[in-house]
Amino acid sequence: MSALGRYDRHCDSINSDFGDSVRSCGPEQEELHYIPIRVLGHGAYGEATLYRRTEDDSLVVWKEVGLARLSEKERRDALNEIVILSLLQHDNIIAYYNHFLDSNTLLIELEYCNGGNLFDKIVHQKAQLFQEETVLWYLFQIVSAVSCIHKAGILHRDIKTLNIFLTKANLIKLGDYGLAKQLSSEYSMAETCVGTLYYMSPEICQGVKYSFKSDIWAVGCVLYELLTLTRTFDATNPLNLCVKIVQGNWAVGLDNTVYTQELIEVVHACLEQDPEKRPTADEILERPILSWRRRDMEEKVSMLNRSNKKPRTGTVTEAPIAVVTSRSSEVYVWGGGKTTPQKLDVFKGGWRARQVCAGDAHFAVVTVEKELYTWVNMQGGSKLHGQLGHGDRASYRQPKHVEKLQGKSVQKVSCGSDFTVCITDEGQLYSFGSDYYGCLGVNQSAGSEVLEPLLVDFFLNEPVDQVSCGDSHIMALTRSKSVYSWGCGEYGRLGLDSEDDVYSPQKVEVQRGLCIVNVCCGSDGSFLLTLTGKVLACGLNEHNKLGLNQYTAGIINHEAFQEVPYTTSLTLAKQLSFYKIRSISPGRTHTAAIDERGRLLTFGSNKCGQLGVGDYRKHLGINLLGGPLGGKQVIRVSCGDEFTTAATADNHIFAWGNGGNGRLAMTPNERPQGSDICTSWPRPIFGSLHHVTDLSCRGWHTILIVEKVLNSKTIRSNSSGLSIGTLAQSCSSGGSGSREEDSDRESLTSDPSRGFRGTIEAEPETGPFNTTENMESSSCPSWLRQELEEAEFIPMPDTPNFVSAESSQNGTTSMQDVRETPPDALEKPSFQACTCSTLQEEVRKLQDLVSTYRHEQELLCRENSRLALEVQELNGKLQSAMQMNQVVNKHGEAIHQIQKQLSLHWKSSPPSSGNPEMSREDSDAESWCFLGTEACRSSSGTPM
């Protein structure tokens, strides 16, 4: 299908969304859940709001367009952006996911770019020129995006630094397709004056037709700004600016001492006055300065986009349902002498937390914007070794952003005893803090302490998916499902079949056929979870905290107990094989696990009741918790020093074990009278109902994220009866030819930086009524006067069956002709009958036709099934016939052998007495009896 055909098809499908006033929620409709985070900005037509989509925990942007206060042209632009984006799929183009209609507000769901735009990037350079490699990296991505949209037959018409967005990994995303235009071929032209003045090509300024080469001019302007940090053309007013563009008077020259001549030639080629002499996007990519880097850059783009890439949850032909739930999100900490949960006011609103982790002496939090915050715990008193990553050893009591990771999207973080490790969206691993045991993974090449995040080069070609830290060792799971470990090797906690310390990542050999999906480190042991829910463990098994001990009881042998002190290689925890484990959390002396049914299992030491079984006795095996947790589905669990905290699906939080130093958030008044400081039964804590999204316990401390639902709203794509079907028709017709029919005007928007950054659209020709005196003297608003001036008068016949010959010839009558018509000729206006019923009848006929086709299709499917069965039956008969043929062939061969034997027998035997001829004939008849011939049958009836 051609690009134009796809454009029309998408336009019609989107129009059906807007045109239908009511549509039932069928079983095929998908329900998507969103949580608003913060407002990103305000535009001319509405707000841009950041949302978190709970299905995949991703961030998306909802672009709101208030349709009620827009002109028809502006509505068409909004619809046009959806149509264009739905056609384009490229790593350097803003991805479109969905659109919804809430009353009179159009909501467009787009990809979120957390690195701002190229305009802000240039401003923040502060006269510090970009490196040429950086410019080439940006240029390659921009031109790749332009090449994609041009191949789809789309003219962007508003390429500028404000519409070029970036991620924190410097991945370019070309956006804002509201002014984009679909052309029927590469030779088609457009003529409407649209775009931003600073980036307008000379042909647009001169009011002549333009093509895809106009976008190349804008690319040249963007490249010029990257090289000079200034506008290509600058002026105090629009007229002077257009003159400079047409004359080609650049603001400043290019410095060939900083940039190569090849790169400067690209600028000159793109800013060629003659459009025919400008290169295409593909020709720019083929230039030597980019071509020899192209493969590496394409691989880099693909790798950086891997974390952002997600399948579209719906197409424009579907009608998904959006469930928007407003939630309050808060972070609480307690322990270390603090018995009351303390709320951290830093993590709220747009800076809410998505992951938390506790270390022995510090906390770490990753926000929804994927920024890392660290600070010391409330206990304090411990010497710091740089595990906060702030470049010093200061004890920051409040959460502080790790500035050295600015520009990096931190996905996950894990804390050790005195070090911290985090991974980014690209799978890069950073470490900082103490390197005494080699936990930083750089072979102790950076010193005993690293105060700032340090990139571990080992994983540059092996992106990391998960990381977990013990007290003094680390395990990492890569995206290729390989497991690596390093650090202290005591008790074999690294799973490397030895107890040696390792200062750089070493691959852990996993049994063939096992797919590891999760790694988790305890204080001196490690766990690996497989795809089937099995558990592999290594390290110290004191108190059976790894679940490796074997305990059996029977009639003959009343008790059989096999203890495993420790293991240096990965060993299957057989006692856990009866369950399909979904998550596991090791503490210092015990471990808790959750199976696929949400049941909680505990094993290890029970000295302080941390197993939650209602007593303080020693338990040798695995304990399936009941009591207060009986029948509840546990969703989160974490183990600290001699205590356990768990959260359930019904929004309750439980804690049990050693309550000393505030570990259980239990004040003396809450403790039952006469009881000790420990509790062996899970007890609810934390007051009212809260949904826990993440939980971490370490030492005496607990940190968690809790959410409360404030309100919820369901948005259906077709919840409004607002119809803008004419907009879809105009979009579709606009893309079918080489000439645009746009005649709307858009006023020039102001530029906060003293310029003309905004987008304008103006028709070069003026209407015929600009000099009409009575129109000028009237109190009619200017916009309405303009609409009347450009309107056309369509005469309507008196009856639906009557068609004026003049109307059929002229089609429409201009307003000038109406003025010249005598008044008496206009006294009796005629009206055409409403054709809505006719259209409805046509729709019903089409629906009947579709139903007929569907019925015929079902019949064909049944017939195909029947024929398939017959073919299968015939194949079976054919196989039987072939087998019979083989049997017959074998019998024939046997008969042939018998014939040969008989022939030899008669030749070797002497002739019998009597008539020799008669004897020979009788012998022949006897021999043929083996064949069942007629001679044999006839002779058998003759008496001997």
UniProtKB/Swiss-Prot annotation:
The keyword Metal-binding applies. SMART domains: S_TKc. Keywords: ATP-binding, Cell cycle, Cell division, Coiled coil, Cytoplasm, Kinase, Magnesium, Metal-binding, Mitosis, Nucleotide-binding, Phosphoprotein, Repeat, Serine/threonine-protein kinase, Transferase. Its main location: cytoplasm. It comes from the Eukaryota. GO terms for cellular component: centrosome; cytoplasm. RCC1 repeats lie at residues 370-426, 427-480, 481-532, 533-597, 598-650, 651-708. It catalyses: L-seryl-[protein] + ATP = O-phospho-L-seryl-[protein] + ADP + H(+); L-threonyl-[protein] + ATP = O-phospho-L-threonyl-[protein] + ADP + H(+). The modification Phosphothreonine is found at residue 192. Residues 726-782, 794-825, 906-925 are annotated as: Disordered. Its EC number is 2.7.11.1. Autophosphorylated on serine and threonine residues. Dimerizes through its coiled-coil domain. Pleiotropic regulator of mitotic progression, participating in the control of spindle dynamics and chromosome separation. Important for G1/S transition and S phase progression. Phosphorylates nek6 and nek7 and stimulates their activity. Homodimer. This is Serine/threonine-protein kinase Nek9. It comes from Xenopus laevis (African clawed frog). The gene is nek9.
